[in-house]
Amino acid sequence: IIEELRCESNKGFKLIPPFEIVISRNKVVVDLGTLTDAYEKEITIHTTATSKDGEKTILAGKDVTIIDTVKLDGLKKGTKYQLKGWQMLKEENAELIINNKRVENDYTFVADAEAMKVEIAYTFNASALGGKSLVTFEELYDLSNPEEPVKVAEHKDIDDDGQTVLITERI
């Protein structure tokens, strides 16, 4: 059996599936030709964070919701994925913690197309966040093996305006 192993030089490539060769005569040379790996399609994430109304500003309050619309491209049809996201305080470049817990959410789905759009909602108490900018970060995991999820993409740009929502103070 000939099996290609993952290493630095084939990173980003789809491995050749293992195959078996049976040689039944002595002193025979078997020419396998050139075995090449195909490029693995890279998964990309593009996101837009807004209020429920599609606005980039939200009035501070006890029950604030940010909707994160995530466009994914390069998915493998039929594969189970989990999208994990959380809120960051832009000015501090730190996770948003409320009541000793990170403001986070996740969404698990099976890809029915190579390109998909999904939404994650974050609802939390933003009473004390007037004047703060919040940025949504995401990581996408392949759950083909539920025992060992594999991170396949991430979008963590603290300066991305598309991922940023401003919490305004009540007047």
Residues covered by each model-derived region:
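Solvent-exposed loop/turn and edge beta-strand elements of beta-rich ligand-binding domains
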Residues: 1-171
